[in-house]
Amino acid sequence: ADAPVTIVEYFSLTCSHCASFHNDVYDDLKKKYVDTGKVKFIYSDFPLDGVGLRAAMMARCVDERRYPGVIQVLFKTQNNWARAADPIAELKKIGQLAGLGEEAFESCMQSEALANGILAERQKAGASGVQSTPTFRIEGQLYPGSRSIEEFSEILDPLVAKN
């Protein structure tokens, strides 16, 4: 959809502040701005560690229509899989729930092209000023750290009104 305002979220699936945003603020932001066509929301991987990279890879291997839902599940269950003795096995279970078969999961985890693509995305974001997660790029301006729906509204309402 051609929403007038774009938000890019730079996130790591192992970042607790990112999980707080997705668990506490994202649904309100989506209802108020994305579902109404005012804002386009783009996910940009910025993995902070190897487990975060693997989680990002798994999410990217799922059918793209299921991607936003998988991201939400990963954040809602972050404490379970990210701190598990075997996080990859936990990611595999989540992938299976999203329709990613065992072979598809294994080839996904072994895809150097996918890993390199995600790391290149992170490097590009870093070069453009992103230093931590979550960071939000709203119409070219960077906003590091999680924010409340009220804080997002203060930023977004004038931009939406302008367009």
Regions found by a protein language model. Name each.
Residues 7, 15, 105:
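Residue-level signature of catalytic and energy-coupling elements of molecular machines
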Residues 1-5:
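A short beta-strand-turn-helix
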Residues 12, 93-163:
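C-terminal cap of thioredoxin/glutaredoxin-like
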Residues 11-13, 19-96:
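Structural alpha/beta surface segment adjacent to cysteine/selenocysteine redox centers
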